[in-house]
Design a protein with these regions (language model features):
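Short, N-terminal intrinsically disordered low-complexity segments that are rich in Pro/Gly
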Residues: 1, 23-24, 48, 52
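Juxta-kinase regulatory segment immediately upstream of eukaryotic protein kinase catalytic domains
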Residues: 1-17
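Conserved phosphate-coordination/catalytic loops
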Residues: 2, 28, 57
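Membrane-targeting and insertion segments and their boundary/processing signals
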Residues: 4-8, 30-33, 120
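Intrinsically disordered, low-complexity segments enriched in polar/charged residues with Gly/Pro
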Residues: 9-13, 21-24, 63-65, 74
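ATP-binding glycine-rich phosphate-binding loop
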Residues: 17-35
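ATP-binding pocket architecture of kinase catalytic cores
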Residues: 35-144, 148, 154-158
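Central P-loop NTPase core of STAND/AAA+ ATPases
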Residues: 160-165
Length: 165
């Protein structure tokens, strides 16, 4: 067993999930990986973020802010930030894509998303995030994020590199 696997196993055991079945989930555009844990009828998500550049502390802080605003964010059941480990509430597989494919009205989903954005715009105060080390979202960061579309999304979605055309 690798040192990372031992760290994860110890974390899960300490929080009662050591014997849980583990199913890998699709990741996001980061070095993090996610496992769905199953223990009888209970489910949870393990966020494994071993890369120091993918600090979990901002995730925790943002989840807390969203909760204070009355918005949904996964409950953090356990955290070991120095090791990049979080045990999260499992919201299930109800992504917009899946829900729309199952017949949910897209307009209703987008209305809910816009409502959440309106709450953030109306009620969020920057001093609530003063301890979160997030980069300023300026033109340079915007371009960097847009380039992820070409560098990450296009190859994943189309199976080939993006072209200038």
């Amino acid at each position: 067993m690798t040192e990372r696997a031992e760290t994860i196993s110890s974390f899960l055991t300490a929080h009662g999930w050591g014997a849980a079945a583990r199913t890998p989930l699709a990741g996001d555009a980061s070095a993090r990986r996610y496992l769905r844990l199953a223990r009888g009828d209970e489910r949870a998500i393990l966020m494994d973020s071993p890369n120091p550049a993918e600090d979990v502390v901002p995730f925790i802080a943002i989840a807390n802010i969203l909760h204070r605003l009355g918005l949904s964010a996964p409950e953090i059941k356990a955290a070991q930030p120095d090791d990049g480990l979080l045990l999260l509430e499992d919201f299930g597989d109800g992504t917009f894509t899946r829900l729309i494919a199952q017949g949910t009205d897209p307009a209703e989903l987008y209305r809910l998303a816009v409502d959440a954005l309106a709450v953030i715009h109306r009620d969020f105060r920057p001093d609530q995030a003063s301890t979160i080390n997030l980069p300023r979202y300026d033109a340079d960061l915007f371009i960097e994020q847009v380039m992820l579309l070409a560098d990450v999304y296009v190859p994943a979605a189309l199976g080939r590199a993006a072209t200038a055309a």
